[in-house]
From Swiss-Prot:
It comes from the Bacteria. This is 4-diphosphocytidyl-2-C-methyl-D-erythritol kinase. Keywords: ATP-binding, Isoprene biosynthesis, Kinase, Nucleotide-binding, Transferase. Belongs to the GHMP kinase family. IspE subfamily. GO terms for molecular function: 4-(cytidine 5'-diphospho)-2-C-methyl-D-erythritol kinase activity; ATP binding. The lineage of its organism: Bacteria, Pseudomonadati, Pseudomonadota, Alphaproteobacteria, Hyphomicrobiales. Its EC number is 2.7.1.148. Pathway: Isoprenoid biosynthesis; isopentenyl diphosphate biosynthesis via DXP pathway; isopentenyl diphosphate from 1-deoxy-D-xylulose 5-phosphate: step 3/6. The active site is at 18, 146. GO terms for biological process: isopentenyl diphosphate biosynthetic process, methylerythritol 4-phosphate pathway; terpenoid biosynthetic process. Catalyzes the phosphorylation of the position 2 hydroxy group of 4-diphosphocytidyl-2C-methyl-D-erythritol. ATP binds at residues 104-114. It catalyses: 4-CDP-2-C-methyl-D-erythritol + ATP = 4-CDP-2-C-methyl-D-erythritol 2-phosphate + ADP + H(+).
């Protein structure tokens, strides 16, 4: 029996990669959380969460990045399960959760948070709790600052601007589905380490978005920043040549996502994306080099 065969009522959800097209650090709160302005899209590539009712709780992991996943209660997937069960009551059925781990760990594309968000959505349906997005987002925020963002991504997939510590969400119009290459050479960067390496925490916020069409979006991105990039490069200098490689392969725009070290590159069309992905994969065996498309803005 494979991990995705059903023995009873079950749900499978995509936990999409979260791509920070731009990330401005605008301050820091007294409790240590940084204030951020972020333009975020979600990719059609990601992890998958499969949950079914069972006789007892269980958690299993498969996939190319399964080996680095903690199986105990420290895992965000299990924290999400337990938080929702605490909210819904002790009579909720046991569940078997399977995580197909396709995204690199500690790579700046929201893998663990997206897994937890997909778990909240799947269990909300499986347990018939009927909690609205705001309630699920509040539960998610108790687990991590980027859970509300990732919950939006798993539920809707549409681009957004996130502010505050990541909990203030607003839709962005005009962003098309972007042919996008995600690349990681195996470098893992812990988000707290990158934030600790910041030398400047008071920066200008994002300018008003101007994203109608891919060319306009790329022009807009050139006016924005990833304020975590210098800190990430100080910890992992290999990020810089990776960005140069993506630009040399014909990317319209390339940048590091989030706290790194995954980089993204936007291409003009699917054929340019496919060609670049193949060349990079052939030249760099063992790299995570995955072609994808982001989900577009609401029509």
């Amino acid at each position: 029996m494979t991990a995705f065969q059903n023995a009873g009522p079950s749900i499978t959800r995509l936990a999409p990669a979260k791509i920070n097209l731009a990330l401005h650090v605008t301050g820091r709160r007294d409790d240590g959380y940084h204030l951020l302005d972020m333009l975020v899209v979600f990719a059609d590539q990601g992890d998958r969460i499969h949950i079914e009712k069972a006789g007892s709780d269980s958690f299993t992991v498969s996939g190319p990045f399964a080996s680095g996943i903690p199986a105990g209660r420290g895992n965000l997937v299990l924290k999400a399960r337990d938080a929702l069960r605490q909210h819904g009551g002790p009579d909720l059925s046991p569940v078997a959760i399977h995580l197909e781990k396709n995204l690199p760990i500690a790579s700046g594309i929201g893998g663990g948070s997206s897994d937890a968000a997909a778990t909240l959505l799947a269990l909300n349906t499986l347990w018939q709790l009927d909690l609205d997005f705001e309630m699920l987002a509040a539960i998610g925020l108790s687990l991590g600052a980027d859970l509300p963002m990732c919950l939006h991504g798993a539920a809707h997939g549409t681009p957004l601007i996130a502010r505050g510590i990541g909990e203030e969400l607003n839709d962005v119009s005009g962003i098309a589905a972007l042919p996008m290459l995600l690349v990681n050479d195996g470098t893992a960067l812990a988000t707290p380490d990158v934030f600790r390496a910041l030398t400047r925490r008071e920066n200008a916020p994002l300018p008003p978005p101007a994203c109608e069409g891919t060319d306009a979006l790329c022009a807009y991105l050139r006016e924005t920043r990833n304020d975590l990039l210098p800190a990430a490069i100080s910890l992992a200098p290999q990020i810089e040549p990776k960005l140069a490689l993506l630009r040399a392969k014909g990317a319209l725009y390339a940048r590091m996502s989030g706290s790194g070290a995954t980089c993204f590159a936007i291409f003009s069309d699917k054929s340019a994306l496919t060609r670049a992905a193949k060349e990079i994969a052939d030249e760099n065996p063992g790299w995570f080099a995955v072609p994808s498309h982001s989900f577009p803005s609401r029509a």
